[in-house]
Amino acid sequence: MAAVPGMSDRLRLFLLPEYRLQNLDPKNERIEKYSGSKYEPVFTVLSKRAAPKDSAGRTELIFGFGCLLTTLVTCFIYGTDVNSLNEGFVAKAMLAAAATPEGGIVSTETLQAGKEVVSRLLPVAFGLLGLQIVHDLGHYIAAKVHDTKISLPYYLPSLQIGIFGSITNFMTFPKSRKALFDIAISGPAAGFLFSLLATIYGLTLTVNASPDMLANFPAVPTGFFSSSFLLHEIVNQYLPISKALPDSLTYIHPLVAVGVTGLLANALNFLPIGRLDGGRVAMAIGGRQAADQIAFITLIGQAVSIFSDASPIYFFWIVLVVFLQRGADIPPEDDVTPVATELEDEKKSLSWFTRALTLAFCVSLTGTMVLPVPKPFTPTTTMAPAQAPKPILAPSPNVAPLPSLAPLLTSVPLLSEPEPVDI
């Protein structure tokens, strides 16, 4: 097209696989690459007008800002969930929520209680947003390297875990499968890495904290750490959870909750479905047809999990995916050349390693799926005391959700409802 003046400014050339089931030469090695069916590479020419929208309009900007504000609210609600089993937090929250100013003046005690409540919510809310920003920066840096434009992120609020992630769309066609792969995997890779670092650093702060500091940390049942194989192995290096009863409470630094939630959000986004990061990686490595088959199997697995004892998180996530991210993404301009001929095995290894990390996090020691936070205990629940006299493990009191906080406590069951224990 370069030989014709002005042609390259009006037309875009694509190299795409055309799948055929008959009349193919089986000796042609190129037609068996990366798919279950045979294909022939064909050139396709499109007008440059047939392209994704390359700039955000006012409506998109307003919608994106609204998503950001809503996500900020749900992250604060999730912060309330995370702290809901800490007696001190509940007492302060009740004081701040129930106080009525006399003569238009709020007491100093009430103001102090409100400040303490907010100070415990801020690390969780902004920690979650920070990890998501790191995830999105991974996409943007890779897109910049490959001269590809992507949209501003549209954040997905969640009442279960604060934030499900974000949606980023391609605003120009990726140049190749390699570009698609690098852009897609860079977000989850950065998100997994920083979430893991936050979890480990939070555990270090937990171990080194004084008893007074621990009293201000979120409390979760020790059995929570067995809800994920990967999480159990990491936490067991720092806390003596293997010697504690599952229903005893463990106090953890807020960064642990933030890191674990970040791992979950990145794992969900790396599922190989449609326009999710995992779906884009699958399409870059295996082609569109293979990616569609993998997505179908994954969707069936997600649907089955809805009827199991898995977290309701997966129900809300699959609904979002089906309505927003189910369809295949736009193709790269070169959709035939492998991800990288000389680095093909390394690219595949990175993809499988990330998928294995996702599976290790999502599968628990008991066969159920991972949950981010425990369900607030009811007044009839009797918790077993911890057997280990460590400061980070404490007997659980009977904690009931307060009426003023009940709308905010949207946690989901951990593994199963705790059985009453006679003490």
Go through each PLM region and give its residues.
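Hydrophobic transmembrane alpha-helices and their immediate loop junctions
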Residues: 1-423
